[in-house]
Amino acid sequence: MTDVQAALELIKRGAEELLVEAELVEKLESDRPLRVKAGFDPTAPDLHLGHTVLLNKLRHFQELGHQVMFLVGDFTAMIGDPSGKNATRPPLSREQILENARTYQEQVFKILDPDKTEICFNSSWMESLGTAGMIRLASRYTVARMLERDDFAKRYAGGQAIAIHEFLYPLCQGYDSVAMRADVELGGTDQKFNLLVGRELQKHDRQAPQCVLMMPLLEGLDGVNKMSKSLGNYIGITEAPREIFGKIMSISDSLMWRYFDLLSFHPAVEIARYRAEVEGGRNPRELKVLLAQEIVARFHSHAAAEDALADFEARFQRGVLPDDIPEVNVVVGDGGLPVFQVVKQAGLTGSTSEALRMIEQGAVRLNGERVEDKGLVLQRDQTVVLQVGKRKFASVVLN
């Protein structure tokens, strides 16, 4: 395998789509550091693991010797990215944006090498563009082209409002690539239209068009929806080590492999070996421990990871749980099953009303943590430990 082939294999690991691969190969063969861009609008103060999918890929480019440009979209955050949205997003204040941007810079260097990272703010060129420049930029795209975007098309067809400033967002993101002379831009699959606008604007400016690497959107703890703070299915990178560790241990066995592919720095061949070992009978919980330790160590320290493991074992394995916990199978189906129904079907209560009452009294624990939300839905393909009161336990296989 040549150096370029090996580099391409690492770059494509976990990626959903690469446009255009032949162009990227040509850039890699030029034997110069590529300018690799990824933009983050500081719309919330903290990053979660879903954001780190792009950061991890940026780290891969750094390991290959390329220059990473971490773009803080302080200007575009005032517009609000309409990608995947069915309504106009409320704008943030300048003060909110700047404070969020400050915390982003503190957090990204838990993954990125600061010596190989260029922090950029798109206000530095967008604000100097001026009204005349913005009009010239807007003239390069038509309303018809904008309505090719799926989210805009759906809103237009449904009679929902689309504000004029929302059309400016993909143009501004695309212009960032012109200003930064990007060779490669990374983004989520929901960003495809915006990323391709960057290629078009670069061509218009007589630049070589950037290659576009799209990464999948990371599923949250429920294994169904995109990781999101609004859905409560996220793992924040500033959370306590114990919280991060426990949340990773709670994911389904099938979701574990997705997290390994997108969040772990373990080599692909090693992950393939883990899969084979699980198929051969190894307990997947052992591998979740490896993953949880790796993630905690990345955002805290190796010592914190060891402490989190010790805490987890103390709560779930060493003397806290009886040795003879019965194992029961509960069919939950594709849509999951509310926790109170799982409690009842596991035989831990005589009725669903009793299960609900026990949850309200704080007497139900899931993997050692008190269940606060009686509407919590458990997904299939995982094994959980349920406890009701002090003496009732069950290891529940959800399928």
Curated annotation (Swiss-Prot):
Primary localisation category: cytoplasm
Catalyzed reactions: tRNA(Tyr) + L-tyrosine + ATP = L-tyrosyl-tRNA(Tyr) + AMP + diphosphate + H(+)
UniProt binding sites for ATP: K229
EC numbers: 6.1.1.1
PROSITE patterns, per database record: AA_TRNA_LIGASE_I (PS00178), S4 (PS50889)
Gene Ontology terms, MF aspect: ATP binding; RNA binding; tyrosine-tRNA ligase activity
'HIGH' region (motif): residue ranges: 42-51
Position of the signal peptide: none
Keywords of the record: Aminoacyl-tRNA synthetase, ATP-binding, Cytoplasm, Ligase, Nucleotide-binding, Protein biosynthesis, RNA-binding
Gene Ontology BP annotations: tyrosyl-tRNA aminoacylation
Cell location: Cytoplasm
Enzyme class at the top of the EC tree: ligase
Cytoplasm as UniProt keyword: yes
GO cellular component: cytosol
CDD domains hit by this protein: S4, TyrRS_core
Chain span(s) of sequence motif 'KMSKS' region: 226-230
Function comment: Catalyzes the attachment of tyrosine to tRNA(Tyr) in a two-step reaction: tyrosine is first activated by ATP to form Tyr-AMP and then transferred to the acceptor end of tRNA(Tyr).
Family: Belongs to the class-I aminoacyl-tRNA synthetase family. TyrS type 2 subfamily.
Complexes and interactors: Homodimer.
Record-linked NCBIfam families: tyrS
This protein's name: Tyrosine--tRNA ligase
Organism: Aromatoleum aromaticum (strain DSM 19018 / LMG 30748 / EbN1) (Azoarcus sp. (strain EbN1))
